[in-house]
A protein has these predicted regions:
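Eukaryotic helix-grip
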Residues: 25-220
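Bacterial N-terminal signal peptides
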Residues: 8-20
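Positively charged n-region of N-terminal signal peptides that target proteins for export
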Residues: 1-6
Length: 220
C-alpha cells in the first residue's frame, strides 16, 4: 500500500498508481498527482506494468531516531497505515534490520493481500541522511487460503533532517498488487491511501516511546 511501508506502509498504497487528474508537474519523471496539508503525492509509469510507482514527500515534526522507531514498530502499523490489518514481527536480525509479515484489508469483492518484508536501515554519517530499503521476500512464509500473496514489491524511505526536530521524509513504492482490482476500489485507494497514511503518521510518530528512542548507528 499501499499501506505507505515501513512498507508496512507499504501495500496500503499499492493502488496509488491510478491516481486521477495528475497535474503536469514532473520531478525526475515523477508527476505531481496531488498535494494536501504539505503531503505531496507523485506517480510515474513502471515498465511492463499497468500500475504506476508512487512517491510521497512531506515534512514531519520528528528526529531521525523518532521516525525510525515508528517505522520499526511494525506491529502498530494498523494504527497509521491505510487499510493495514495485521502485522507480525518475524525476526530481528539487528536493531536496524528486521523481517515482518503484513496483511492488507482489501474491500470485497477483491481478496486481502499479504507480504513479507525485509527492512534494512543505514545512515550516511556525514549528511545524516537515512536510507531504508524494504523489499518483499517471496517464499519466506507459507501462503494462506483466501489471501493473495504479493511477491514483487520494493519500498524505500529517504529521511533527511531539515531543522531542529524536523525531518523531510520521502517514501517510494513499486509493487505488483497481483490479480485484478475493480476500478472503484482502485480509485478508493488512490484518493485516500497515501494522504490518510501520512496524515496518521504525523500523529503516530509523536508517541513518547518514539521520542525517547535512540540507536547506536543513528544520529539526529
Amino acid at each position: 500500500m499501499l499501506k505507505l511501508t515501513s512498507l508496512c506502509t507499504l501495500v496500503a498504497l499499492i493502488l496509488s498508481g491510478f491516481l486521477p487528474s495528475a497535474k503536469l508537474v514532473a520531478q525526475n519523471n515523477w508527476i505531481l498527482a496531488s498535494e494536501h496539508e504539505g503531503i505531496m503525492i507523485y506517480t510515474r509509469a513502471m515498465q511492463n506494468s499497468k500500475v504506476k510507482a508512487v512517491k510521497v514527500v512531506c515534512n514531519l515534526n520528528a528526529t531521525n531516531s523518532q521516525l525510525v522507531a515508528a517505522i520499526l514498530d511494525v506491529e502498530t502499523c494498523n494504527e497509521w497505515v491505510y487499510h493495514s490489518k495485521r502485522n507480525v514481527l518475524i525476526k530481528t536480525i539487528s536493531p536496524l534490520d528486521i523481517i515482518y509479515y503484513a496483511e492488507v484489508d482489501v474491500p470485497w469483492p477483491a481478496e486481502n493481500r499479504d507480504y513479507v518484508v525485509h527492512i534494512q536501515i543505514t545512515q550516511n554519517p556525514q549528511s545524516k541522511v537515512i536510507s531504508i530499503n524494504s523489499p518483499c521476500i517471496p517464499g519466506y512464509v507459507a501462503e494462506k487460503a483466501g489471501i493473495v500473496r504479493i511477491s514483487n514489491s520494493v519500498g524505500r524511505w529517504t529521511i533527511a533532517p531539515v531543522g531542529k526536530s524536523q525531518v523531510r521524509a520521502e517514501y517510494t513504492l513499486e509493487v505488483d498488487p497481483m490479480g485484478d482490482i475493480p476500478a472503484w476500489l482502485t480509485n478508493l485507494f488512490a484518493t485516500k491511501g497515501p494522504l490518510e497514511t501520512f496524515r496518521r503518521l504525523k500523529v503516530h510518530v509523536q508517541k513518547d516511546e518514539y521520542k525517547k528512542a535512540r540507536y547506536t548507528n543513528i544520529s539526529n
